Amino acid sequence: MDTKKKRRVVITGLGTVNPTGNTVAESWANIKAGRCAVGPITAFDTADFKVKLAAEVKDFDPAARIDKREARKMARFTQFAVAAADEAVRDSGLALEEIDHTRFGVILSSGIGGLPTIEEEHTRGQQRGFEKVSPYFVPMSIGNMAAGQFAIRFGLQGMCSCPTTACAGGTNAIGDAFHRIRDGYEDRMLCGGSESCISPLGVGGFASMKALCTADDPARASIPFDARRSGFVMGEGSGVLLLEELEAAKARGAKIYAEVVGYGANCDAYHFTAPAPGGAGGAACMRLALADGGVVPEQIGYINAHGTSTHLNDSCETTAIKTVFGGHAYKLAVSSTKSMTGHLLGGAGGVEGVFTALALHDAFLPATVNLQEPDPELHLDYIPNHGRAAQVEYAMSDSLGFGGHNACVVFKRWEG
């Protein structure tokens, strides 16, 4: 592909609600400080559960950020997403009344959608009859509704889509939005992901797969790349990026966080939950992203890894990095911010995209916290326990999902 003829795409707005903070400023300050947001589950009684910990969003009042009447019609994952989108649009300084709304689109992922709403309405149906469930039940619970609410809220008439590629979805959303602008279909896109399924059925389902950590100590639960890692910790929240065609952004004097330069997406075609042996699919995806952006492996200085704290993921992802980067794998920095946020599933790529853009913009690489016992079989620079000031030119964000979905986005530092 001849990337010289393609339009350039930059990030001009960021928004998030996640376990480390309900705004970008709050979250990034806590990420830089290495504060882990994992704690006891409060969303429901865990007395009969082996899993006791999650990374919950705290002190989120939807009525403070969304019209109360509208918030009542939204599931929690949509409330998070709308709040994050509002922040991203405000942050961008974009005057919505002055742009062509047919050239502004949305791609927002959710892996599971309104699962707690489904549980609540099922209980109500059993108690009162299923024809007496909420009339908002269906639009609240379907996964595409957060994307639809963005479009309705801001009057966006470009493409509006919802990738449901599990834990790769948020990164797929960013990459697909990047391509839509680069290839001339839209001039601006809101993109990212959102998830909220810390509920009895959500936790129970992943626990029955033996995918979740059952530790009691929050500091020894989400521990990517640690020798004692034993499963992921469920998180919740949303991350939204506003992408814009470079010349349009420059024409209005927009603040630019970073440039998006490459995107890769593929499938392992191996197993419905396990990654391909040796991380072959992930490695191929990284190569696709590098080639798409015309970037060579030695130019990458930081990778925000998928890093779920499961034995298979962390091992396969590390092997994939070594395969793609060779000797340079030992020179670049790799970290998993899931050590602080937990795993946001379909929302993970959006939040981690926000963090990767900020890492480039602020010249600060976040840590993998609580990494106390490094796995001797992995041995890369995982930025253990303390983030560091470092200016890198290119960074990569990886996401891998059930079904064999792989997604990777390459970002470039903006020099003005």
For every predicted segment, state its role.
Residues A47-E56, G113-T117, S196-S222, G264-A284, ...:
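Active-site-adjacent elements of ketosynthase-type condensing enzymes
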Residues A81-L94, G143-A146, A151-F154, M159-E195, ...:
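Active-site-proximal alpha-helical scaffold in enzymes
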Residues G13, I31, A85, V106, ...:
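Conserved small-residue
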